[in-house]
Amino acid sequence: PDKCIRCLRCIEACRQVQGIGVIKLDHTGTNAAVSFGGPWGESETCIQCGQCALVCPTGALAVKDQTDRALDWFDDPAVTTVVQFAPAVRVTIGESIGARPGENLQGRIVAALRKLGADCVMDTRWSADVTIMEEGTELLERLLRQKEEGTLHGHPDTMFTSCCPGWINHIEKNCPDMIPHISSTRSPQAIFGALAKTWLPKSLGIPAERIRSISIMPCTAKKDEAARELLKHGGEPDVDLVLTVQEFAAMLDRRGIDLMSLEPAEFDSPFMSEGSGAAQLFATTGGVMEAALRTVSALAGGPDLGRIAFEPVRGLVTFKEAEVETEAFGKLRIAVVHGMRAADEVIRMVREGRSPYH
């Protein structure tokens, strides 16, 4: 609280950008201050999105740092560390080290993790492909059912993607009536974590208890996802620890590792490290939806969809839509939203029976 300068950016991000409003002001006028009296993350409406910490200029709000724990595991010979990192990380890490915008640093990240002490370094794109096959198949089944029922066009049974943990928290806490519209597929992080604790130990010939599964993600909310009870087996989490890109950059700095001076290295296991172009789309806003739609078209025997042209809805950059012509289902309408406030607009459409999106 002593670091708070009353800029109110956190309140603005929570209330205006996300539409949640869990952060409050204490008092009024010159005595106004952000309330630090209650545990926001434990409130009934906080979605653990991390946007408040993102905009805080002084560090009064900060992400829970887990770098010490990760470094301890890297240094422990009795522990086998398995690290995955998301497609976006290979580009976003460059912002912290002065690399060219958009430069792909995948190989150097792998080399840096080995230098830190990671035993296995693998690619989240592999589990992203698993997610897409599951989610694409689920969407295909929904479309086939609606086609048979004659409800495919007009106001279809809209399906939402399920990879964003902040979005899932928002649905569960604030819009539980929308749960039937959410894909049942786990996120790539969760799928990878489950396999890292089950299949991988057998493949490596070591006890599962030795594995510590670490992921590097571009989103703070992934920390909350890893702690979900539904993503544990025998009381132990599938993903033991999540580092943000900022935490990873801080670890490199602490150990004196210059990312740009390293020779690029390859991932450890091709079985859990090869990904398709569909998986690469996960790094972009709306990429999961686009990958699922392209998978549906392929599974239904249709041609490549080509470039999908999105148009802003009512001029909003946070809400865009597109019509896609498919061989099996005719025209399908899709939407991409950025931020919970924009997502709430689609939720209202679904509730009122006027959503045109599939």
Predicted segments with their positions:
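Iron-sulfur-associated redox domains of electron-transfer enzymes in respiratory
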Residues: 62-358
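Cysteine-centered iron-sulfur cluster-binding motifs in ferredoxin-type domains/subunits
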Residues: 1-17, 38-59
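Short charge-dense sequence patches
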Residues: 2-8, 22-24, 54-65, 141-145
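Non-heme iron-sulfur electron-transfer modules
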Residues: 16-45, 59-81
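Short N-terminal signal/transit or membrane-insertion segments
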Residues: 12-17, 24, 56, 89, ...
